[in-house]
């Protein structure tokens, strides 16, 4: 009866100990049996940091680097943005491509970091400026590239923006600037900070000449950039979800000892509170900017605006 309470001991195939002794300890038995691990090439796929959707990198590029799952806008390089925006995908003329940053303060390791970014991005600085066509109209455009020193504004970045504005004035063209920056470049000290005043003064001259300036803020736009030229547009536009502000959320909360809203400093929060004119999806950006430029450059566009404007001259 007792033997009925217990099942029979199951038998398993065994490998003689002398056989195992002949197999080196470092041998992967699964590979010896013919099973091979498949390696995924680096950069083949990308995981959305917001919703976790997996994209093939090529599909993500075709979708203008926007997540198909949650519409999260990935950062774009300056060449990618120019290709997506301009009529021919390239600048008709690039300005000041040979301007290179020096190390005026002798900051340790600064030149080495610049050289590394130059090699990684194939750029000389954190912004590309030039003239191109948008919707058939000539424009002067600047695009910041966050791959280069987080697109921080140093003396060369400020100088290139100022010169681009001066070119817009000389050529009587609209000026469009895409911002993406961590702020002023600390390695250049006060030379970096004074670019805020210099670029703002140049935009004041552009305004006196009654020429259009459209500022497009992308993620992230912070510090001295948000406190100067990026907030001075005739139209201030941002991409969805872009983080825009001066100091970071944590610094502000620690200073005022209050909890901030969850959507604080997002493009949508700023639009709701009157600090932006539009939040425009990347797929609609080219069409939106084309319409704004057309409206402000053609006589037909001006007349259409005057007819629809509630502000009538007396």
UniProtKB/Swiss-Prot annotation:
Zn(2+) binds at residues 48, 51, 67, 70. Binds 1 zinc ion per subunit. The keyword Lipid biosynthesis applies. It is found in: Cytoplasm. The keyword Lipid biosynthesis applies. A zinc finger (C4-type) spans 48-70. PROSITE patterns: COA_CT_NTER. Keywords: ATP-binding, Cytoplasm, Fatty acid biosynthesis, Fatty acid metabolism, Lipid biosynthesis, Lipid metabolism, Metal-binding, Nucleotide-binding, Transferase, Zinc, Zinc-finger. GO terms for molecular function: acetyl-CoA carboxylase activity; ATP binding; carboxyl- or carbamoyltransferase activity; zinc ion binding. Residues 44-311 form the CoA carboxyltransferase N-terminal domain. Its EC number is 2.1.3.15. GO terms for cellular component: acetyl-CoA carboxylase complex. Pfam families: Carboxyl_trans, Zn_ribbon_ACC. GO terms for biological process: fatty acid biosynthetic process; malonyl-CoA biosynthetic process. Belongs to the AccD/PCCB family. Component of the acetyl coenzyme A carboxylase (ACC) complex. Biotin carboxylase (BC) catalyzes the carboxylation of biotin on its carrier protein (BCCP) and then the CO(2) group is transferred by the transcarboxylase to acetyl-CoA to form malonyl-CoA. Acetyl-CoA carboxylase is a heterohexamer composed of biotin carboxyl carrier protein (AccB), biotin carboxylase (AccC) and two subunits each of ACCase subunit alpha (AccA) and ACCase subunit beta (AccD). This is Acetyl-coenzyme A carboxylase carboxyl transferase subunit beta. The gene is accD.
């Amino acid at each position: 009866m007792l033997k009925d309470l217990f099942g029979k001991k199951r038998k398993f195939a065994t490998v003689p100990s002398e056989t195992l002794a002949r197999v080196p300890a470092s041998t992967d038995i699964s590979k010896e049996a013919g099973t091979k691990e498949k390696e995924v090439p680096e950069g083949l796929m990308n995981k959305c940091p917001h919703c976790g959707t997996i994209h093939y990198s090529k599909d993500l590029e075709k979708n203008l680097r926007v997540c198909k799952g949650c519409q999260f806008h990935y950062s774009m390089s300056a060449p990618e943005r120019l290709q997506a925006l301009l009529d021919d995908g390239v600048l008709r003329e690039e300005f000041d491509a040979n301007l290179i940053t020096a190390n005026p303060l002798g900051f340790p390791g600064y030149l080495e970091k610049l050289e590394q970014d130059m090699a990684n991005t194939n750029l000389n600085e954190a912004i590309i400026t030039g003239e191109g066509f948008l919707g058939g109209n000539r424009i002067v455009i600047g695009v910041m590239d966050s791959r280069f020193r987080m697109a921080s504004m140093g003396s060369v970045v400020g100088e290139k923006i100022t010169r681009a504005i001066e070119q817009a004035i000389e050529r009587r063209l609209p000026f469009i600037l895409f911002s993406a920056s961590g702020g002023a470049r600390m390695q250049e000290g006060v030379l970096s900070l004074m670019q805020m005043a210099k670029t703002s003064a140049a935009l004041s001259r552009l305004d006196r000449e009654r020429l259009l300036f459209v500022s497009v803020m992308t993620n992230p736009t912070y510090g001295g950039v948000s406190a100067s030229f990026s907030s001075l547009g005739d139209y201030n536009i941002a991409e969805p979800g872009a983080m825009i502000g001066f100091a970071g959320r944590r610094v502000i909360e620690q200073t005022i000892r209050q909890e901030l809203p969850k959507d604080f400093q997002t493009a949508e929060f700023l639009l709701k509170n009157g600090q932006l004119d539009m939040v425009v999806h990347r797929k609609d950006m080219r069409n939106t900017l084309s319409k704004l430029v057309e409206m402000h450059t053609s006589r037909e566009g001006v007349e259409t605006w005057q007819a629809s404007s509630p502000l009538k001259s007396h």
